[in-house]
């Protein structure tokens, strides 16, 4: 027995999965053919661009500064001068033991960086303020021991 779609039904009167289905007919869109020509290659003459060279200033400077804080004991100074490719300078600072460390340096293209360190003993050590540390008391409470 066949149903309205042509599927074979079993004589038992029940329904079963169809034996096979045919795929619908597929339709394809028409293919459009395009004729593309190769792009035309054109070469242009290079454009000459005028570049203005900025003048390079001659490197020359000089600076110095100093700090003298008696409260913290921060005592230092520095000075430096540059003339062309030669840099000369020095800095000094007071060490915690009261001595003064002075560094004199020079740097140039021929000799590189060179430094000489001098140490001058201090007349008296710089007193550093002691740090006061106070701890809060720890509260301890013992739990009572209970026997059953």
From Swiss-Prot:
GO terms for cellular component: extracellular matrix; extracellular space. InterPro entries: CHIT_BIND_RR_consensus, Insect_cuticle, Insect_Cuticle_Struc_Prot. Keywords: Cuticle, Repeat. It comes from the Eukaryota. It holds the Pfam family Chitin_bind_4. Sequence repeats lie at residues 16-19, 22, 28-31, 37-40, 44-47. Residues 58-128 form the Chitin-binding type R&R domain. One of its GO terms (molecular function) is structural constituent of cuticle. The tetrapeptide (A-A-P-[AV]) repeats found throughout the protein are also present in many proteins constituting the protective envelope of other species. Component of the cuticle of migratory locust which contains more than 100 different structural proteins. PANTHER family: CUTICULAR PROTEIN 76BD, ISOFORM C-RELATED, STRUCTURAL CONTITUENT OF CUTICLE. This is Cuticle protein 8. It comes from Locusta migratoria.
